UniProtKB/Swiss-Prot annotation:
Main location: mitochondrion
MF GO annotations: identical protein binding
Organism from which the protein derives: Bos taurus
Basic and acidic residues bias spans: 78-88
Gene (name only): BNIP3
GO cellular component: endoplasmic reticulum; mitochondrial outer membrane; mitochondrion; nuclear envelope; nucleus
Name under which the protein is recorded: BCL2/adenovirus E1B 19 kDa protein-interacting protein 3
Lineage: Eukaryota, Metazoa, Chordata, Craniata, Vertebrata
Function field: Apoptosis-inducing protein that can overcome BCL2 suppression. May play a role in repartitioning calcium between the two major intracellular calcium stores in association with BCL2. Involved in mitochondrial quality control via its interaction with SPATA18/MIEAP: in response to mitochondrial damage, participates in mitochondrial protein catabolic process (also named MALM) leading to the degradation of damaged proteins inside mitochondria.
Modified residues (Phosphoserine): 54, 66, 86, 92, 95
């Protein structure tokens, strides 16, 4: 094909499923497809148009047989990428009709399946389970045995009547036991040495 041929003939020749690219070499030894020099930027537009046409026809036939599926966050990202891509196409000599058509398709996809966000965010996995957090509480420290923590010490201290009623008899009894044990051991030792 040459540049003098009409663009309609160029598009008609590309409607087949295979396109042959003949590689030639430019002056510096690297190979460049001849079609790049022929179309000079029109190749991208032709390929995009062919992609959109084949996408529409294949999507119509494939949607008849397949059940509808819910939209995922990735689908939304793809839709927004298509939207930004279509903005770039509009600036690159894209017709206003195609731009508006693509824009409407993207908006309809987003409106039709916008409930997935609500469904996804209200899943039971995202609500923290209260019972599980109760199981992992840090155990309380057991209080150490101390005179300071007793109810007697908290009420009146060392000189309170309740404390003295308990402390003085126990002190006297422990001293009497210690003295009695000391006397018993002392006598045993003295009698055992005299028998030898």
């Amino acid at each position: 094909m040459s540049q003098s041929e009409s663009p309609g003939l160029q598009e008609e020749s590309l409607h087949g499923s295979w396109v042959e690219l003949h590689f030639g070499s430019n002056g510096n030894g690297s190979s460049v497809p001849d079609s790049v020099s022929i179309y000079k930027g029109d190749m991208e537009k032709i390929l995009l148009d062919a992609q959109h046409e084949s996408g529409r026809s294949s999507s119509k036939s494939s949607h008849c047989d397949s059940p509808p599926r819910s939209q995922t966050p990735q689908d939304t990202n793809r839709a927004s990428e298509t939207d930004t891509h279509s903005l770039g196409e509009k600036n690159s000599s894209q017709s206003e009709e195609d731009y508006m058509e693509r824009r409407k398709e993207v908006e309809s996809i987003l409106k039709k399946n916008s409930d997935w966000i609500w469904d996804w965010s209200s899943r039971p996995e995202n609500v923290p389970p209260a019972k599980e957090f109760l199981l992992f509480k840090h155990p309380k420290r057991t209080p150490t045995l101390s005179m300071r923590n007793t109810s007697v010490m908290k009420k009146g201290g060392i000189f309170s009547a309740e404390f003295l009623k308990v402390f003085l008899p126990s002190l006297l009894l422990s001293h009497l036991l210690a003295i009695g044990l000391g006397i018993y051991i002392g006598r045993r030792l003295t009698t055992s040495t005299s028998t030898f």
